[in-house]
């Protein structure tokens, strides 16, 4: 029996996110006269086994999931973030699928393959794995949309920056806006009371543009207030 690949599960998960009512049928050949979308078989646009299947500019070959994401991703989260997500999430899965280089997420999904001596139906195992992949993918995409929604709020605070310190009225994902900016620090209300302060990293070195003094590290609130001069 055919072992299910991670590309199958995430491809199906992506399609179900785009259309929750879609009916997905596994098979080894495209039925004659079939007019629906086909991936991973059939030598069509979403079958990476086809001759001259596309390869990314960085050399990472596409698998079915990557081909579907290239088509659908920009419609879900916009072209810029779709490209970032391809690089961080989709490409490693495509690379493992094409080369067998190893990927921990692929190993987790592979745990849903039916055992060689088990009684589980392959289609049931596939459905369970797709449900996991769909839940994971949906949360990743919603996280990206959350960052997108924060952009206007963070940019507004950046416009009020003083002494390279950005003050947010509430916590919001700030890195995409502040790392490329001249901001060195960001402060916002802490869930534990008071305020939280973070250094903004440099885009190239990934180190704080201006680190806090080493002597502040690990100090209790009272001592930190004394050393920093901030009550």
Where are these regions (language model features)?
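Short helix-capping/linker segments at secondary-structure and domain boundaries
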Residues: 18-22, 73-81, 205
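Short active-site loop/helix that positions an aromatic residue
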Residues: 10-19
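Active-site nucleophilic cysteine motif
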Residues: 7-10, 62-64
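Hydrophobic beta-strand segments of well-ordered beta-sheets in folded domains
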Residues: 22, 35-36, 163-164
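Short, small-residue-biased leader/transition segments that mark boundaries at the very start
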Residues: 2-6
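C-terminal accessory domains and tails appended to enzymatic cores
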Residues: 27-29, 53-58, 101-231
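A basic- and aromatic-enriched beta-loop-alpha substructure that forms the phosphate/nucleotide-
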Residues: 36-115
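A short beta-strand-loop structural module common to alpha/beta enzyme folds
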Residues: 21-32
């Amino acid at each position: 029996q055919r072992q299910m690949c991670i590309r199958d599960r995430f491809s199906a998960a992506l399609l179900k996110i785009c259309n929750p009512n879609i009916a997905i049928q596994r098979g080894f050949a495209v039925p004659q006269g079939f007019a629906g979308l086909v991936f991973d078989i059939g030598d069509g646009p979403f079958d990476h086994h086809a001759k001259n299947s596309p390869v990314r500019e960085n050399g990472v070959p596409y698998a079915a999931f990557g081909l579907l994401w290239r088509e659908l991703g920009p419609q879900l989260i916009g072209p810029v973030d779709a490209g970032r997500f391809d690089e961080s999430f989709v490409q490693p899965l495509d690379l493992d699928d094409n080369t067998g280089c190893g990927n921990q997420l692929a190993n987790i999904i592979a745990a849903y393959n039916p055992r060689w001596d088990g009684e589980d139906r392959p289609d049931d195992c596939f459905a369970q794995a797709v449900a996991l992949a769909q839940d994971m993918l949906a949360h990743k995409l919603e996280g990206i949309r959350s960052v997108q929604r924060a952009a206007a709020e963070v940019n507004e605070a950046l416009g009020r920056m003083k002494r390279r310190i950005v003050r947010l009225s509430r916590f919001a994902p700030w890195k995409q806006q502040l790392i490329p900016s001249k901001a060195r620090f960001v402060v916002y209300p802490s869930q534990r009371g008071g305020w939280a302060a973070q250094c903004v990293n440099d885009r190239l070195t990934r180190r704080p543009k201006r680190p806090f003094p080493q002597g502040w590290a690990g100090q209790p609130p009272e001592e930190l207030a004394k050393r920093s001069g901030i009550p």
